[in-house]
Swiss-Prot record:
Presumably involved in the processing and regular turnover of intracellular proteins. Catalyzes the removal of unsubstituted N-terminal amino acids from various peptides. Mn(2+) 2 binds at K263, D268, D286, E347. Mn(2+) 1 binds at D268, D345, E347. The keyword Signal does not apply. GO terms for cellular component: cytoplasm. InterPro entries: Leucine_aapep/pepB, Macro_dom-like, Peptidase_M17_C, Peptidase_M17_leu_NH2_pept, Peptidase_M17_N. GO terms for molecular function: manganese ion binding; metalloaminopeptidase activity. Belongs to the peptidase M17 family. It catalyses: Release of an N-terminal amino acid, Xaa-|-Yaa-, in which Xaa is preferably Leu, but may be other amino acids including Pro although not Arg or Lys, and Yaa may be Pro. Amino acid amides and methyl esters are also readily hydrolyzed, but rates on arylamides are exceedingly low; Release of an N-terminal amino acid, preferentially leucine, but not glutamic or aspartic acids. The gene is pepA. This is Probable cytosol aminopeptidase. Its EC number is 3.4.11.1, 3.4.11.10. Its cofactor is Mn(2+). It is found in: Cytoplasm.
């Protein structure tokens, strides 16, 4: 079962058993809370024997010495604490949680010599613990061969810090962020037989409880709007498509909205241009962009963000039945532009093209950002350490890059240009949906650019980061929830009134 934590913050606390976590900076002679947890000063000797120096994310796990009110003590290094940023506190919390899988009661002492602890730092530490502890086990009926699944009580965690009032306030926001990330992870991890377009739309509809206005457009309504590109992808599946429009109105009425658009291919076989069988199961995650947008809208509403925001997700399934679109078909998008389908596995851009045009045409937002697990080519270029960033606006691109540095959901800016635009010209239509093997992620972005007019726009290709990324202190899950924290930081730093 995944570990659930129940947090409280206190200026002082004497553990009554359980695990005491003591933070220690590199080079410091004493850890946080040592006077309480180690009254006979035994830990310094244990640290010397264990060669524990306070290096960032290093730990030393010991049975509590005589006289300690705790049963077990974990020393947690935070490195050179003067340079700790938000992400460092998150990772420290994640590293602590990784050592505490079997704990029933935890006390964390943050205020160590040489460490400046703000309320936000304390809240980030707690969020880091939650992010590390997340796991998706909805369909596991047994823990092991002989142990039945049981309901687990939350582990009580007391965080000891002088910044109690600020920490409690900051933790409310941190919890909202965590909820959005976990929602995105849940959606990506769900199997496609459970989460089709209709079911995904229903999950998004639940955001109404937080004050988000949610509209769900049916196939018939999209047909009336002329969304031939999106509907062409969907026509091979027996499961009807949906377009979900989410609005959070937390800003002033006169303020233009910021808009986020997500690709939501709930399962991608490739269609008639079918994918190889090996690894196709991962294509349940081809809706990672839509998951991130839905998670972001949850965050903005839950923390009452002072911004007007729009989230639009195009939900389809790409299947190869007798009514599926074929290579060589020509479809007409909502914009009126025609598209020759060269490869039915280049379907995400067709979905996004109509969604982007619809968003711009109806809402006229101040900016649009789309997220999509769009191309394997971006993984060839950047592996799974960075997402690709494409933009027609330098200011927006710089804001996104800065948000990526804060959250460590990192972006790398890629080019756009007329040379690439020519690669998607078609002999039979206004454009074709693939430009060939070379520059595949760039030509995909160039395709999307034809649907945004002059609106400041950015495209995030998250194919390498939304799912299957290497696990770390903050993510032990296949679905990462990439993009939720990044875009929340973007909004927080630049667009809240």
């Amino acid at each position: 079962m995944p570990t659930k934590f129940e947090f409280s913050f206190s200026k002082s606390h004497r553990p009554a058993g359980g695990v005491a976590v003591l933070l220690q900076a590199a080079g410091a002679k004493e850890a946080a809370g040592a006077a309480v947890a180690d009254p006979e000063s035994v830990l310094a000797k244990a640290a010397k024997i264990g060669k524990f120096t306070g290096k960032a994310l290093s730990t030393l796990d010991v049975i509590a010495p005589h006289g300690s009110p705790a049963d077990r003590i974990v020393l947690l290094g935070v490195g050179h604490a003067a340079g700790m940023g938000d992400h460092d506190w998150l990772k420290a919390g994640g590293a602590a949680a990784a050592k505490l899988r079997s704990a029933e009661k935890i006390t964390v002492f943050l205020d160590a010599p040489g460490i400046e602890v703000t309320g936000k730092a304390a809240a980030d530490f707690a969020l880091g613990m939650e992010m590390n502890a997340y796991s998706f086990e909805s369909y596991k009926t047994r823990k092991s061969d002989d142990e039945p699944k049981t309901t687990q009580k939350p582990v009580k965690v007391t965080i000891v810090t002088a910044t109690v009032i600020a920490a409690k306030k900051a933790f409310g926001t941190a919890q909202a962020v965590g909820e959005g990330v976990f929602l995105a992870r849940d959606l990506v991890n769900e199997p496609a037989n459970v989460l089709g377009p209709v079911e995904f739309a229903a999950r998004a509809k639940e955001l109404e409880k937080l004050g988000v206005e949610v509209e769900i457009l049916t196939e018939r309504e999209m047909k009336k709007l002329g969304m031939g590109a999106l509907l062409g992808v969907a026509q091979g599946s027996s499961r009807p498509p949906r377009l979900v429009v989410m609005q959070w109105k937390g800003g002033k009425a006169k303020d233009k909205s910021v808009a986020f658009i997500g690709k939501g291919v709930v399962f991608d076989t490739g269609g008639i241009s079918i994918k190889p069988a090996s690894g196709m199961e991962d294509m349940k995650g081809d809706m990672g962009g839509a998951a991130a947008v839905t998670g972001l809208m949850h965050v903005l509403a839950a923390r009452k963000a002072a911004v007007n925001a729009i989230g639009i997700i195009g939900l389809v399934e790409n299947m190869p039945d007798g009514s599926a679109q074929r290579p060589g078909d020509i479809v007409t998008s909502m914009s009126g532009q025609t598209i020759e389908v060269i490869n039915t596995d280049a379907e995400g851009r067709l979905v996004l093209g109509d969604a982007l045009w619809y968003c711009n045409d109806r809402f006229k937002p101040q900016l649009m950002i789309d997220l999509a697990t769009l191309t394997g080519a971006i993984m060839v270029a950047l592996s799974n350490h960075y997402a690709g960033l494409f933009s027609n606006d330098d200011r927006l691109a710089e804001q996104l890059l800065a948000a990526g540095l804060v959250t460590q959901e990192r972006l790398w800016r890629m080019p756009l240009g007329k040379e690439y635009d020519k690669m998607i010209d078609s002999k039979f239509a206004d454009m074709k949906n693939t430009g060939g093997r070379h520059g595949g992620s760039v030509t995909a972005a160039q395709f999307l650019k034809r649907f945004v007019k002059d609106t400041p726009w950015a495209h995030l290709d998250i194919a390498g980061t939304a799912m299957g990324s290497p696990t770390d202190e903050l993510n032990q899950s296949w679905g990462s929830g990439f993009g939720v924290r990044l875009l929340d930081q973007l909004v927080r730093a630049n667009y809240e009134s």
